[in-house]
């Protein structure tokens, strides 16, 4: 693939993720949109690592590190969402203000 195609794909993923994060009212959907944003960043890391640094794999290693951090973030986020759902019986963002009660 050419550089422009990969950058357009990454910008689409980033745009969809930011739009979904802003407009989402469900916590699980917001977490999925955050994962889309992180995947767009990973695509850029791998693309520019391949373009500028052919012999060293710094971008690839960094993207694997980001994938690991994103997996931990998703696990912790789902655990928090599960606890909120258990207490509040809802995963809607506007109904989960823990400072009210």
From Swiss-Prot:
A Pfam family hit: Oxidored_q2
InterPro entries: NADH_UbQ_OxRdtase_chain4L/K, NUOK/Mnh_C1-like
Topology in membrane: Multi-pass membrane protein
Keywords: Chloroplast, Membrane, NAD, NADP, Plastid, Plastoquinone, Quinone, Thylakoid, Translocase, Transmembrane, Transmembrane helix, Transport
Keyword Repeat applies: no
A GO BP annotation: photosynthesis, light reaction
Main location: plastid
Compartments, as annotated in UniProt: Plastid, Chloroplast thylakoid membrane
UniProt keyword annotation of Plastid present: yes
Reactions performed catalytically: a plastoquinone + NADH + (n+1) H(+)(in) = a plastoquinol + NAD(+) + n H(+)(out); a plastoquinone + NADPH + (n+1) H(+)(in) = a plastoquinol + NADP(+) + n H(+)(out)
GO cellular component: chloroplast thylakoid membrane; NADH dehydrogenase complex
EC number(s) recorded for this UniProt protein: 7.1.1.-
One MF term in the entry's GO annotations: quinone binding
Chain ranges passing through the membrane: 2-22, 32-52, 61-81
Protein task: NDH shuttles electrons from NAD(P)H:plastoquinone, via FMN and iron-sulfur (Fe-S) centers, to quinones in the photosynthetic chain and possibly in a chloroplast respiratory chain. The immediate electron acceptor for the enzyme in this species is believed to be plastoquinone. Couples the redox reaction to proton translocation, and thus conserves the redox energy in a proton gradient.
Family: Belongs to the complex I subunit 4L family.
Subunit organization: NDH is composed of at least 16 different subunits, 5 of which are encoded in the nucleus.
NCBIfam families documented for this protein: PRK05715.1-2
Name the UniProt record assigns to this protein: NAD(P)H-quinone oxidoreductase subunit 4L, chloroplastic
Organism: Ranunculus macranthus
Lineage per the UniProt record: Eukaryota, Viridiplantae, Streptophyta, Embryophyta, Tracheophyta
Gene: ndhE
């Amino acid at each position: 693939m050419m550089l422009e195609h990969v950058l357009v794909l990454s910008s689409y993923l980033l745009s969809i993720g930011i739009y979904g994060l802003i407009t989402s009212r469900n916590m699980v959907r917001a977490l999925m949109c955050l994962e889309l944003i992180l995947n767009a960043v990973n695509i850029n890391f791998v693309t520019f690592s391949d373009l500028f640094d052919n012999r060293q794999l710094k971008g690839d290693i960094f993207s694997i590190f980001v994938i690991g951090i994103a997996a931990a973030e998703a696990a912790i986020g789902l655990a928090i969402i599960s606890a909120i759902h258990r207490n509040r019986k809802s995963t809607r963002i506007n109904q989960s203000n823990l400072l009210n009660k």
